[in-house]
Swiss-Prot record:
InterPro entries: BTB/POZ_dom, SKP1/BTB/POZ_sf, WD40/YVTN_repeat-like_dom_sf, WD40_repeat_dom_sf
Source domain of life: Viruses
Protein name in UniProt: Putative BTB/POZ domain and WD-repeat protein R786
Species of origin: Acanthamoeba polyphaga mimivirus (APMV)
Family listed: Belongs to the mimivirus BTB/WD family.
WD repeats: 241-281, 286-325
Length: 492
């Protein structure tokens, strides 16, 4: 069938046998159409033409929510894609779903979850929800688009309670070499994207909504505001000749300091409050990684630097070395308590007490596979991965009960409740905050999983692919909304 010819019969009133008059509060649309086409496309029209008083009428008037969109829908029965309005996309979509529901037509409710609705359209969203029914997808959309300072008291406690599960205080940020992208952790929808001028070598979160970015072959550190999506400052010092070849970067939250290392074996400390360099230290080895201690604040255990063969230096608040650990490790990370280091290679796994300066526990790595990464998945639980990002073993280490059980290990044992929610597949990048019980995991360089306060989000695929880093940021609006909802429910 040639739908274009069929549609021309409508324009030319050829073989038409009924006139449909669509009326809304403002507009009126007249269409000469074919009963057979409408009845075969919609149960509503089949019933209208066969079961009611309109059966033998040549002109039928129908009162609809929007006459123009309703006419577009009837045109779609003739294989046409028509938009006869000048509405913004969000308005057209909401009204279209009301009209589709009125005509008893099927629609894909998932499309709604990606809509961004301005404050002036929120009442239309609620109207649409009342028309097509409150369901998970609609509730997600409502939760995401509630305007600031909206009067939440119009909602019942039951409905407010149902909205809470669709509101998350955090968003996910992915770095893709040339772009920074922010995603809604619940829906997986991209909220915003920031294009970069060049590929970056390092990216680090340095505040609630600030990230530091170092480009390849650049001698500057750019501070980006994720809210304004703009460079708010540039850190640069002409006296540091090798700063263009930075090898590592970390953020000391308690002091608001940014620590960088470069190929000239220098450790450089920036005060982000004054945007000035406050310390330049010469070290006798190339630093490959810097890891900040975000769990506890001590004068002597601020962060660690890791050099060749995982040789470790522990740094104090004056940026002097408080301890050195020379051990042939392949991977190193802080424990959940921040008081110990977990060290591992192809032969063993060790727990090193930083305060005491000694090994608390050592066990053989009888997988004989060299670990290349370790992820603190929650509290005192860890997964070690090999060079192919495949899991090697699963660790439980509880520093509070170290005298009773120091280390439990079983190869490929993923029966922990957390791990049940994440497939034990290849992991490329992760970000966590054990204090806030947050973990984000990236697999296959594009698939994101998250767990926040024990609740699973994802998986969802992000674009562009080839994620080079991942972290999370608090959503101020969502946090305020949750607080308002909780206060209302508490006082009702």
């Amino acid at each position: 069938m040639d739908f274009n010819i069929l549609y021309s019969f409508v324009s030319n009133k050829t073989f038409t046998d009924v006139e449909i008059v669509l009326i809304d509060e403002i507009n009126r649309v007249n269409m000469n159409v074919h009963k057979a086409v409408l009845a075969s496309s919609s149960q509503y029209f089949l019933n209208l033409f066969t079961k009611f008083s309109e059966t033998n009428k040549s002109t039928i008037t129908i009162r609809v929510r929007d006459s123009q969109i309703s006419s577009d829908i009837i045109c779609s029965f003739y294989g046409q894609i028509v938009d006869s309005t000048n509405y913004p996309d969000w308005k057209y979509t909401l009204l279209k779903y009301q009209c589709l529901d009125y005509f008893s037509l099927d629609y894909n409710i998932d499309i709604l979850t990606g809509l961004k609705i301005p404050s002036e359209g929120f009442d239309l969203l609620l109207e649409t929800a009342n028309t097509i029914g409150y369901r998970n997808e609609i509730n997600k959309l409502i939760a995401k688009n509630i305007p600031d300072n909206y009067d939440l008291s119009i909602f019942s406690d039951e409905f407010l309670g149902s909205l809470r599960k669709y509101i998350c205080k955090h968003n996910i940020i992915t770095a893709n070499f040339k772009s920074i992208n922010i995603y809604d952790v619940i829906t997986g929808n991209k909220l915003s994207s920031l294009s970069l001028n060049n590929n970056f070598s390092h990216v680090c979160k340095v505040g609630k909504n600030i990230i530091a970015i170092v480009y390849y072959c650049a001698d500057k550190i750019f501070l980006f505001d994720l809210v304004s999506r703009d460079v708010i400052d540039t850190l640069h010092n002409l006296d540091i000749q090798s700063s263009c070849d930075m090898t590592a970067i970390c953020y000391i939250k308690s002091l608001n300091h940014l620590v960088t290392a470069n190929s000239n074996n220098q450790l450089i400390v920036w005060d982000l409050t004054t945007r000035q360099i406050i310390k330049i230290k010469k070290v006798n080895r190339l630093i490959n990684r810097l890891i900040a201690n975000h769990t506890i604040i001590t004068d002597y255990n601020l962060f660690i630097s890791i050099g060749y063969n995982e040789s470790i230096l522990v740094w104090d608040k004056n940026y002097t070395i408080s301890k050195g650990i020379d051990s042939p490790n392949k991977i190193t990370t802080y424990s959940a308590s921040g008081r110990e280091l977990i060290l591992a290679n192809a032969r063993y796994i060790k727990i090193f007490d930083i305060d005491e300066g000694k090994i608390l526990y050592k066990t053989n790595n009888d997988t004989f596979r060299t670990p290349y990464d370790i992820i603190n998945i929650c509290d005192n639980s860890y997964i070690l991965f090999d060079s192919d990002n495949e899991p090697i073993c699963y660790l439980i280490y509880d520093w509070k009960n170290v005298s009773k059980i120091r280390l439990n290990r079983s190869k490929k044992n993923y029966d922990n409740i957390f791990c049940k929610k994440f497939p034990p597949e290849s992991v490329n990048y992760s970000a966590n905050d054990t204090n806030s019980n947050i973990l984000i995991v990236v697999t296959d360089y594009h698939t994101v999983y998250a767990q926040i306060n024990g609740k699973k989000y994802g998986p969802f695929v992000v674009k562009p692919n080839n994620i080079a880093g991942v972290f999370f940021v608090k959503d101020k609006k969502a946090t305020n909304l949750l607080n308002s909802i909780n206060d209302l429910i508490k006082h009702n």
